[in-house]
């Protein structure tokens, strides 16, 4: 099966690895510029090189995986794909435009799936000549076991079953979800991160204290502010805004502190600063501990 992955950023790279690591799958890793797609594959290669250096993978295995990932432009590589998974920026207009372009070039039997973390599958697919489905991976996509399979209003049952089968084939656990804002995981998880930001903003505790409390008291592997940085505070904010706008419920109001941080470019680990400062030696320091 040939899988097109649209977006060669962090999620796209992980999704590409998730498929390429399994026999029977090849991947077209696409972005809007050739060099961006090639850069995505380069980052994948560097990640595997670290595993080889630690003797966790063989070079032969890595070479085989990388040979199955072809970087390029969607108009060149996606014409013969059996499945296309979009992992572009979390913006409705971007996603609708991307799929409208793909609809003109992909073969009729190709399945369209979006990795959106919160947006309406029905709206993304509106106007297309084929069904749309949500196939929501979690970061890092090659290692996290869950895939949320989201059915929109017009998603046929056979498409849902096909995606669930593919998810199992690549070693994932599919959970079927009927379309709703935030789906399952993010409707629970992102408000928790948002509430942790309110606790920080109100001075109830400091960053290290909030994260330590949830790790030690709730047995979470990462504290909520640390996790927000890992996900990306811009992504967290976008999801909170979707939850609030879709439901109208004030409990989903985004914390002003997160909005202010995003406006200032402090997005978390990917920008080098969020609730923590990320140092060159891969250590991190809470911003309120300086």
Predicted regions located by residue number:
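NAD(P)+-binding Rossmann beta1-loop-alpha1 motif at the extreme N-terminus of oxidoreductases
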Residues: 1-50, 54
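NAD(P)-dependent Rossmann-like dehydrogenase/reductase catalytic/cofactor-binding core
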Residues: 23-24, 157, 161, 168-179, ...
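Acidic/polar active-site rim loop that often engages polyanionic ligands
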Residues: 25, 79, 140-150, 221-222, ...
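Rossmann-fold dinucleotide-binding core
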Residues: 111-178, 183-187
């Amino acid at each position: 099966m040939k899988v097109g992955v649209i977006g060669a950023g962090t999620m796209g790279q992980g999704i590409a690895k998730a498929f390429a690591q399994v026999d029977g799958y090849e991947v077209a890793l696409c972005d809007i510029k050739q060099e961006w797609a090639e850069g995505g594959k380069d980052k994948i290669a560097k990640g595997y090189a670290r595993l080889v250096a630690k003797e966790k993978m063989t070079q032969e295995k890595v070479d085989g995986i990388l040979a199955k990932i072809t970087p390029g432009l969607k108009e060149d590589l996606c014409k013969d794909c059996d499945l296309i998974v979009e992992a572009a920026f979390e913006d409705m207009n971007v996603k609708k435009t991307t799929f409208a372009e793909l609809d003109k070039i992909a073969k009729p039997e190709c399945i369209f799936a979006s990795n959106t973390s919160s947006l309406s599958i029905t709206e993304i697919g509106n106007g297309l000549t084929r069904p749309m489905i949500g196939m929501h991976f979690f970061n890092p996509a090659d290692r996290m076991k869950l895939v949320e399979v989201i059915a929109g209003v017009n998603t046929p049952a056979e498409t849902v079953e096909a995606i669930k089968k593919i998810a199992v084939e690549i070693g994932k656990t599919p959970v079927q979800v009927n379309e709703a804002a935030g789906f399952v995981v993010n409707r629970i998880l992102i408000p928790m991160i948002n509430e942790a930001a309110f606790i920080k903003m109100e001075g109830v505790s400091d960053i290290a204290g909030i994260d330590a409390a949830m790790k030690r008291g709730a047995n979470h592997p990462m504290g909520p502010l640390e996790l927000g940085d890992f996900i990306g505070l811009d992504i967290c904010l976008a999801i909170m805004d979707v939850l609030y706008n879709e439901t109208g419920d004030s409990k989903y109001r985004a914390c002003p502190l997160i909005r202010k941080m995003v406006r200032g470019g402090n997005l978390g680990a990917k920008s080098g600063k969020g609730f923590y400062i990320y140092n060159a030696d891969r250590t991190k320091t809470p911003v309120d501990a300086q």
